[in-house]
Amino acid sequence: MPVNVDRLKDAVEVLGNRVRIRVYVKPEGRERRLRLEEGELVFYTDEPPLEGRANASLINFLARGLKVSVKNIEIVHGARSRSKVVEIRDVADPDALLERLASIVDEG
């Protein structure tokens, strides 16, 4: 079930036409999903944390769910860590992007 946008405020930062999302990644799961657990976004992926596969899974999941180009998404902090900061660039309408984010996040 999607969450309310207000519940994402601790995990999201809007910087003009950029949006930064703090995500904790749990690799080698059964499926790909994004959950809100105790105020933190947690991405579960079926990919292992090898050769950037879990990172690519996260970027592709966000691109598809948020309807943005993969080239506009970058992991700006934590590429080799499970705690990451993902930046989405060239966001025309941050409020609409946050609504789309809320629609792909499950309650944890």
UniProtKB/Swiss-Prot annotation:
Q: Which HAMAP family match?
A: UPF0235
Q: Which top-rank group of organisms is this from?
A: Archaea
One GO cellular-component annotation of the UniProt record comes to: cytoplasm
Name this protein carries in UniProt: UPF0235 protein APE_0182.1
Q: Which InterPro entries match?
A: DUF167, YggU-like_sf
Source species: Aeropyrum pernix (strain ATCC 700893 / DSM 11879 / JCM 9820 / NBRC 100138 / K1)
So what family is this one in?
A: Belongs to the UPF0235 family.
